[in-house]
Amino acid sequence: MINKETKIVVLMGGPSTEAEVSRNTGSAIAEALESIGYRVIPMEYDPHHVVENLKKAGAEVVFIALHG
């Protein structure tokens, strides 16, 4: 189980034609997690730099909100 201090990245968007739907989903997930006290980092999916970006953010948990 994760605690409230765990850094949760919500991964959304990206190059898909469903990117906007993904952003809407990701934003709703991030809001819900924040409303119950979790540390959330919304992140736009960049397929060329995803690992690097997750490391820079200090992600401990990744919630994947990608569509398409």
Where are these regions (language model features)?
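ATP-binding N-terminal substructure of ATP-dependent carboxylate-amine bond-forming enzymes
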Residues: 1-68
